[in-house]
């Protein structure tokens, strides 16, 4: 495949086995004005929509793909690689998205991790008897974070939670 101004397309997702690709190929992508690719074509995000956000756009596309896939054969297994850019720098998030999680992480990531584990067990996402894995030893325990640094860490968790992962992962 010939090289283009945006690189050799033989290394793009569609040539690595993905039937459909929508997203960005470069790092540190703007969530407001991204450079997008759909399969092998460059596509433009809407320029006149002040509510546009790449993470919403990617989630909409992922869910539409899932609906189409399930309509074709609901029993057929699938693999969707959903990797929104919003959870990586630069963190472009609408304040209202993050603010709705204000205070939800004030007890820290260890407590949150335990809650998620218990919720996954209750929902049947993980089988009964599954043990919570030990915290990564390179990750500090919440108790070891100095009090004056905790508000910053709490805000980072609020920002991260403000993205669309819940809408994508809770789709039935």
Give the label of every model feature segment.
Residues 168-172:
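Conserved small/polar residues in nucleotide/adenosyl-binding loops
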Residues 2-102, 107, 137-162:
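Formylglycine-dependent
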Residues 105-135:
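Alpha-helical "lid/cap" subdomains adjacent to substrate-binding clefts that gate access
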């Amino acid at each position: 495949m010939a090289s283009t101004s945006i690189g050799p397309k033989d290394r793009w997702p569609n040539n690595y086995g993905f039937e459909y690709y929508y997203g960005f190929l470069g790092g540190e992508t703007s969530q407001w004005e991204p450079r997008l690719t759909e399969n092998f074509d460059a596509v433009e995000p809407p320029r006149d929509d002040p509510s546009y956000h790449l993470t919403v756009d990617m989630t909409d596309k992922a869910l539409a793909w899932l609906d189409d896939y399930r309509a074709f054969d609901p029993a057929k297994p699938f693999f969707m690689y959903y990797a929104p850019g919003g959870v990586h720098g630069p963190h472009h998030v609408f304040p209202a998205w993050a603010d709705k999680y204000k205070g939800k992480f004030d007890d820290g990531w260890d407590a949150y991790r335990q809650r998620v584990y218990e919720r996954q067990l209750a929902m049947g996402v993980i089988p009964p008897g599954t043990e919570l894995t030990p915290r990564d030893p390179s990750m500090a325990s919440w108790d070891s974070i100095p009090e004056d640094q905790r508000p910053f860490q709490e805000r980072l968790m609020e920002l991260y939670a403000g993205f669309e992962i819940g809408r994508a992962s809770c789709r039935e």
